Amino acid sequence: MLRIADKTFDSHLFTGTGKFASAQLMVDAIRASGSQLVTLAMKRVDLRKPNDAILSPLLEAGVTLLPNTSGAKTAEEAIFAAQLAREALGTHWLKLEIHPDARWLLPDPIETLKAAGELVKQGFVVLPYCGADPVLCKRLEEVGCAAVMPLGAPIGSNQGLETRAMLEIIIQQATVPVVVDAGIGVPSHATQALEMGADAVLVNTAIAVANDPVMMANAFRLAVEAGVLARQAVPGNRSVYASATSPLTGFLEVSA
């Protein structure tokens, strides 16, 4: 069970809604993933249409929506987008994203911290997408963010946990949930994140661009479950030395 602010989730896998070939495929994949929290870019939704092709299926699926501010380049733009999302969707939950460079899509730490503090004051449950910077994550926690979402690698890159060393520090010092966001390309990456102590992962591109998104979503569901179970089982310590699993000399003594 995962708790963030005032909500609890059975699944430790969060999913996105971008890059799917169709709205139906998106919904089918989300259902196969078992995800209960789904991010939604406000710039992709036509709020003037009561039956928006993306929003309506998600509402019918019964998932918790996490609108994001993707596309915002400054704190001011992100705050404005957040206010629109709250008014339109009736939710105070928000994934804060501020990335001014469209080529790399790396989060702006200064603008993110600035916006996070203000949005918390305005009553939002803020989950900020941020770099894998332990100092920044602690500062975001201190201004009242309900969780932190450090990247594993650049958005959509499928590179995996390139920031592993920093993620381990963030997880060790955090007192709020840590959600590894961005860069997760295959199910084994998700397993590794959960094994190291992350509370959840957010996956979009790896599922959406797969030849079979529904099958890949199911694979990620199983991978996340495996990671959670492995962590709960408490793995043995690593060692540079070998450790025999069977007696090395007993049979010689019997023969003698």
From Swiss-Prot:
Pathway: Cofactor biosynthesis; thiamine diphosphate biosynthesis
Enzyme category, top tier: transferase
GO cellular component: cytoplasm
Keywords: Cytoplasm, Schiff base, Thiamine biosynthesis, Transferase
CDD domains (UniProt xref): ThiG
Active-site residues (renumbered): 95
EC number: 2.8.1.10
A GO MF label: thiazole synthase activity
Pfam families the UniProt entry points to: ThiG
Residues annotated as binding 1-deoxy-D-xylulose 5-phosphate: 156, 182-183, 204-205
Catalytic activity line of the entry: [ThiS sulfur-carrier protein]-C-terminal-Gly-aminoethanethioate + 2-iminoacetate + 1-deoxy-D-xylulose 5-phosphate = [ThiS sulfur-carrier protein]-C-terminal Gly-Gly + 2-[(2R,5Z)-2-carboxy-4-methylthiazol-5(2H)-ylidene]ethyl phosphate + 2 H2O + H(+)
One BP term from GO: thiamine diphosphate biosynthetic process
Subcellular location: Cytoplasm
Subunit-level organization: Homotetramer. Forms heterodimers with either ThiH or ThiS.
HAMAP family: ThiG
Purpose: Catalyzes the rearrangement of 1-deoxy-D-xylulose 5-phosphate (DXP) to produce the thiazole phosphate moiety of thiamine. Sulfur is provided by the thiocarboxylate moiety of the carrier protein ThiS. In vitro, sulfur can be provided by H(2)S.
Family of this protein: Belongs to the ThiG family.
Protein name: Thiazole synthase
Species whose genome carries this gene: Salmonella arizonae (strain ATCC BAA-731 / CDC346-86 / RSK2980)
Gene name of this polypeptide: thiG
